[in-house]
Structures are given as C-alpha cells and as structure tokens.
Curated annotation (Swiss-Prot):
<keyword id="KW-0963">Cytoplasm</keyword>
<dbReference type="Pfam" id="PF09269">
    <property type="entry name" value="DUF1967"/>
</dbReference>
<dbReference type="InterPro" id="IPR045086">
    <property type="entry name" value="OBG_GTPase"/>
</dbReference>
<dbReference type="InterPro" id="IPR006169">
    <property type="entry name" value="GTP1_OBG_dom"/>
</dbReference>
<feature type="domain" description="OBG-type G">
    <location>
        <begin position="160"/>
        <end position="340"/>
    </location>
</feature>
<dbReference type="InterPro" id="IPR006073">
    <property type="entry name" value="GTP-bd"/>
</dbReference>
<feature type="binding site">
    <location>
        <begin position="292"/>
        <end position="295"/>
    </location>
    <ligand>
        <name>GTP</name>
    </ligand>
</feature>
<keyword id="KW-0460">Magnesium</keyword>
<comment type="function">
    <text>An essential GTPase which binds GTP, GDP and possibly (p)ppGpp with moderate affinity, with high nucleotide exchange rates and a fairly low GTP hydrolysis rate. Plays a role in control of the cell cycle, stress response, ribosome biogenesis and in those bacteria that undergo differentiation, in morphogenesis control.</text>
</comment>
<feature type="binding site">
    <location>
        <begin position="191"/>
        <end position="195"/>
    </location>
    <ligand>
        <name>GTP</name>
    </ligand>
</feature>
<protein>
    <recommendedName>
        <fullName>GTPase Obg</fullName>
        <ecNumber>3.6.5.-</ecNumber>
    </recommendedName>
</protein>
<comment type="subunit">
    <text>Monomer.</text>
</comment>
<keyword id="KW-0342">GTP-binding</keyword>
<dbReference type="InterPro" id="IPR006074">
    <property type="entry name" value="GTP1-OBG_CS"/>
</dbReference>
<dbReference type="Pfam" id="PF01018">
    <property type="entry name" value="GTP1_OBG"/>
</dbReference>
<feature type="domain" description="OCT">
    <location>
        <begin position="358"/>
        <end position="438"/>
    </location>
</feature>
<dbReference type="InterPro" id="IPR031167">
    <property type="entry name" value="G_OBG"/>
</dbReference>
C-alpha cells in the first residue's frame, strides 16, 4: 500500500545554457569567410504540472532533487546548440508551492495547470551573432547562464466541497463509505484514519466531494495528535460538517463539549490559503452538525436532548446512523443545497489550462552603492550587469572589452562618476571584483589591439591571376625573378 505524503521539500535545478561558439568560416577560395559560431542552447526548465492520476507527493519524498538537462554548446557553420529538455514533474490537484520563507508562489488547481518552478539558463551568443560594422570578426563568444536553483516546499491540500471534522472514532470514515463509493479503512480504535479520504456524492443534479479528515483532538492547532498535519486539508472546503459521536463512553465528553473543543481548534488555526481561496477563515465557513450512531438507544436520546441547543446556534442538525443508514437521505439533500448555494455565490471561472510563471522585473534598472567593506569601493546591482558578467570570458581581452562597452551603454560608468568613483576604485558586479578605469564612450577602442577586428580585412592590395601564375612558375624554377624584384 502506498504511503500518503502531503508535504515535501523539493530541490529543483534548471539546466545551464550552452556556451556560444567562436569560429571563423573556412572554405576553399573564400579567404574572408567571416564569423560563423552558433549560439548555445537554452537550458531546460523545471515545471510542475497537475495530473489527475497523481494523488500524493510520495515520489518527491524519496527523490527530493530534480534537475533539468543542460543546453548544448554552439558549433561552427552557424549551428546552434540543442536546447535542454524541460523536466515535467507531475503533482496532485490542490498542490500549493511555497518558497523557503513560506510565501505562496502558486496554488495549483485544475488538471493541466502548470507552474514554472525553475527557469533554464539562456544560451550564450556565438561570434556570428555578436558581429557588427564596428566588430566584424569577434574572436570571442558569450558563456551560457546557469539555470535557477532553489528549494521549494510542496503542500497538498485536498480539493473538496465538504469537510468532515470530529473526534477520533466519531464515524467520519463510515459516513463517507455510505454516502459515496469510497472504501476507507474502518475499525473500532482511535486514529484509524491516517490520511484524508475523498468521496464523490450525487444528490439530484448536484455532485460534490466530501473529505474525511483524520480525527482532531484539543490542541490540534498547536500540533497535538495528527490535527496540525491535516487541518490544511480543510482550507478549500466550502462547508464544514461536525460529526459527533453520541454513543461515546469517554468520561467528560458530550456532543456540546466536543463541538466547542473543535470550534476552538478551527478558530485558532490560521491557514495560508484562507484569503487566497476566497473562503475566509475556517471559523467563518458554513456549518452543519451530524449526530452519529443513532442506532444505539442511549445515543438517540442524547441526540434528541442536545438538538435544540445546537439549532439555537443557527446550524442545521441531523441525527443519523452510518450503520443502519437512518437519516442519510435528508442529510445528503442538505449538503447538496449548501454546496449549490456556495457555487451560485462563487461562480467558477471558465476552465482553461493555466501556466504560472515568475514575474519578470525591469532588467534595465541597476543601482550603484558604496561597498561597506572596501573604502572607496562600489557595488553594482542589477539584472543585466550581473548577467553580462556571468556571460563573459575574462581570459579573453576582446570579451572583456565587449563587457566594458555594454556597461558603458547601460550607463554604469556615468553613474560611477556621479557617485564619486576614482580611477582604480574597486567595483564589484555579481561575484567579480575589478579595479575600475574610466573609459571613453562605448565603441571607441582604448586597447593596443583592436576589439573584434580581423587583420585580413586590412589587406586592400589584391594579387591578380597573372601575378599568382608568375609566382607559381618561379617556385617551380621555370622562370627567374624580374630584375626589379632581385
């Protein structure tokens, strides 16, 4: 029998982008073939997708690490590297995705709903894509970016219309088994139910789902018993039904005190989805009271005695027996009406396949702040500057010059001057620190060797066919040198 796991910590790693290729086209009779290095392939994404055939997070419990494939490196002849394959992770309907700080990133409801858990790194550009009028034959390419790597918390919260709450052995599982075709484990000892059981109930034209939550005890909201682990499964329920054991022989227990104790736990529990689900806190949900085990004579008398007090609270009260099936028909109609009223008040949006992606910030923005650890130093923060640094081959002078041009065009140099940076000041971008030297406007060469130039392009004097034929005959000794060449 498979274990029910409803909370896991998942470490996801997207694929790394492939490096670009620095290559020059070589072909017979084409001395100036030009750059032909292809771009690197994009790394694969890690995607969570709701699958109707998955009902637990068990797979992630045993395999908590998920990594997508990397993109391939670009090649010559303008051949781009292959993209990495996306890794699709199947999750149950009702999975909530949280970050390390407990913030909700996505609430996955509906088969086919997707969430991009980790984005693959961009592939680096090859030198063919980097060529321009000023840089006709770049001798460098850009490196691929690393994929996003993060830890996520996955929590499964059952998607049900009605949640059954009650003390252990109150008969919740028995009630689900007679209302629906579900076959939960039933026995005469406490905490028989260790996992939520879902059942589908049909009443007239209304079909709804019922969730049997493991038994609650006082202190469940503080972690006593099993309640803290399973109270989350009530967060999506539109209607809460108290299932009360009227035949209990435990001292100090009666239907009124049981309901009061459970109400205190529901009021104390603050679910993460209460506001997002649009249902309010658990204490605000519609209630219905089910007095169970009326087939026992003493239980039937007790149910009749406490019914007026419970009805005075404004809650519908039903006396039933899950064993003899007494009172099930009116109970089913009442539950169906409560669910139908809720659906009418909260119309469901048109079903569609949703894809949830992280919000992309403004990539052009950056900031320059003083370095608190290095006097006179500065730290540059921003999406683009940090990405450009990660893409740069610092052992290639042309690549470093290209990075300087990009930073100048973005306005980083201007901002450093405004902040009072002196020549030679330490500047940190990402994980790279360097001594800053002011440059002239972007595109003007300050290095000894030109950035991205091909010396063959400076050969303006061409040798004609006659001269090449004469030189060939001289090499073979068929002719002598001209007097002016001697």
């Amino acid at each position: 029998m498979s274990r029910f796991i409803d909370r896991v910590v998942l470490h996801v790693s997207a694929g790394k982008g492939g490096n670009g290729c620095a290559s020059v086209h070589r072909e017979k009779f084409k001395p100036l073939g030009g750059p032909d290095g292809g771009n690197g392939g994009r790394g694969g994404d890690v995607v969570l997708e709701v699958d109707g055939n998955v009902h637990t997070l068990l797979d992630f419990h045993f395999h908590p690490h998920a990594k997508a494939t990397n993109g391939k490196q670009g090649m010559g002849s303008n051949r781009d590297g292959a993209q990495g394959d996306d890794l699709i992770l199947r999750v149950p309907d009702g999975t909530v995705v949280l970050d390390e700080d407990g913030r909700i990133l996505a609430d996955l409801i509906g088969v086919g709903t997707r969430f991009e858990a980790a984005q693959g790194g961009r592939g680096g550009l090859g030198n063919a894509a980097l060529s321009s009028k000023a840089r006709k034959a770049p001798g460098f390419a850009l490196l691929g970016e690393d994929g996003v790597e993060r830890e996520l918390v996955l929590e499964l919260k059952s998607v049900a219309d009605v949640g059954l709450v009650g003390f252990p052995s109150a008969g919740k599982s028995s009630l689900v088994s007679v209302l629906s075709a579900a076959k939960p484990k039933i026995a005469d000892y406490p905490f028989t139910t260790l996992v939520p059981n879902l059942g589908v109930v049909s009443s007239g034209d209304t079909t709804f789902t019922v969730a049997d939550v493991p038994g609650l005890i006082p202190g469940a909201s503080d972690g006593r018993g099993l309640g803290l682990d399973f109270l989350r499964h009530l967060e999506r329920c539109a209607v809460l039904a108290h299932v009360v054991d009227c035949a209990t022989l435990d001292p100090g227990r009666d239907p009124i005190s049981d309901i009061d104790a459970l109400e205190a736990e529901l009021a104390a529990y603050k679910g993460a989805l209460s506001g997002d689900a649009g249902l309010g806190d658990l204490a605000d949900r519609p209630r219905i009271v089910i007095l169970n085990k009326a087939d026992v004579p003493e239980a039937a008398e007790l149910a009749e005695m406490v019914t007026p007090d419970l009805e005075a609270r404004g809650w519908p009260v039903f006396t039933i027996s899950a064993v003899s099936r007494e009172g099930l028909r009116p109970l089913t109609f009442a539950l169906a009406k409560l669910v139908a009223d809720y659906r009418e008040a909260h119309p469901k949006a048109e079903p569609k396949r949703q894809v949830i992606r992280p919000v992309i910030s403004n990539e052009n923005s950056f900031s320059v702040v003083a370095d608190p650890e290095i006097p006179g130093g500065f730290i540059v923060r921003g999406t683009r500057p940090e990405r450009w640094v990660r893409q740069t081959q610092f052992d290639n002078d042309e690549a470093v010059g290209y990075l300087a041009d990009r930073l100048a065009r973005l306005g980083v140099e201007t901002e450093l001057v405004k902040q009072g940076a002196e020549p030679g000041a330490s500047v940190t971008i990402g994980n790279v620190s360097f001594d800053w030297e002011p440059q002239t406007p972007a595109g003007v060469d300050l290095t000894r060797t030109g950035r991205g130039t091909d010396p063959r392009l400076d050969q303006v004097e061409r040798i004609g066919a006659t001269e090449r034929k004469h030189a060939s005959r001289i090499r073979r000794g068929l002719e002598g040198l001209d007097p002016e060449d001697q």
